[in-house]
């Protein structure tokens, strides 16, 4: 089963302006808000959606992105680990690529580890 995902994983550079035409009311994954740099709005939307769909990997990955960008590294790592604890889901990226939720979470964790090691 593939999920269509409208998200930005900042640590992987997956941001594209291709979805900028969507209205804010359909930005349930926080993609548009993250892409616009409005991390407060993104976090509010994602947290609200996670109350309904707590296990959706695209929401966990996007919230982890918000946490990472706002300096909450331990919270971001916990969400990436939570994605890895669930079955892998094929995700359509805004670029058109299809990537496993596990691959995205693993790459983000590896990148965080590299950043910590170089500090």
Question: Residues of each region from the PLM?
Answer:
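TPR/TPR-like alpha-solenoid helical repeat scaffolds
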Residues: 91-116
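Classic N-terminal secretory signal peptides
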Residues: 1-22
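TPR/TPR-like (Sel1-like) alpha-helical repeat modules
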Residues: 73-90
